Amino acid sequence: MRVWDINPKHLCRKHLLAEHRELHGLWNILTKHKGQGGYSRHPETLRWVGKLKALYERHEALVREFDKRGYHHKTPLDKRLARGSSVQNVFINTLAEQKVILRQKKCECFVV
């Protein structure tokens, strides 16, 4: 489970779509399941507790990138549930570390 903190324009198709899928799973854990169940104690889940507004904004950034690339988005999040902080300031890996991780994957991400 990973929600990157890198600007979505730098993600390859594979990672952009995967993050979108993971973000929806995370959103459901935190909203529908009230932070309970399978991945509720995962570090990626825990860093978004109290930051649904920031998670919503990340989703919207992904959707804007979808639009730029001509992808069709059909899974909006309920904005009414986007509460809490609009800023994510907890990182599992720093931005620099995330770029290294993506470079090591030898994918088509555009990280410099």
At which residue positions do the language-model features occur?
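Expand to "…catalyze enediolate/carbanion chemistry for C-C bond making/breaking, isomerization
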Residues: 1-112
